[in-house]
Amino acid sequence: TDFTVCASDFDESTVTADTPAELVEMLARGKCRAVSAQHPGAVVIGCDTVVDVKGEVFGKPHSVEDARRMLRALSGAVHEVHTGVCISDGTRTESFVDTCRVKFFPISEAEIERYAATEEPYDKAGAYAIQGRAALWLDRIEGDYYTIMGLPVSRTIRLLERF
């Protein structure tokens, strides 16, 4: 099956929510709606991911210092990764949120500095790529690994099959 990846022009700054899970679902729905409007009749999947550290939402870091701050907060701690997925065919829209709990080993300041000096953390929620160098910090996961990567594949496929 052919597919096209498109960036959404949805303004994420307009969205507020009571919980991180509500936030990612609203963001996924907004992105999906924006792309659906540009591609009538297409089946569109919109996604968004945030990291939740004790109620503080970490999106993508805006600077090196922001990445360092996030990584220090994640060091040795349990956090949750929430990914919202929305699918629409233009007439029907469905969405869900998948949540995964992640625990990192303690991360040394030297490791944080080395990692923040790479390109890897800057386009990832929570400033880390679980499939990259950050895999070295992983103590345990409760939930779907692919939720951490930004698309809970098995749940997404199950929903997509209904369209």
Regions found by a protein language model. Name each.
Residues T1-C6, R162-F163:
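N-terminal G-site helix/loop of the GST-like fold
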Residues T1-D2, D11, A77, T118:
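A short linear boundary/processing microfeature
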Residues A7-S13:
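Short, acidic/turn-prone active-site loops that include or flank metal/cofactor-
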Residues A17-F163:
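Anionic-ligand binding patches
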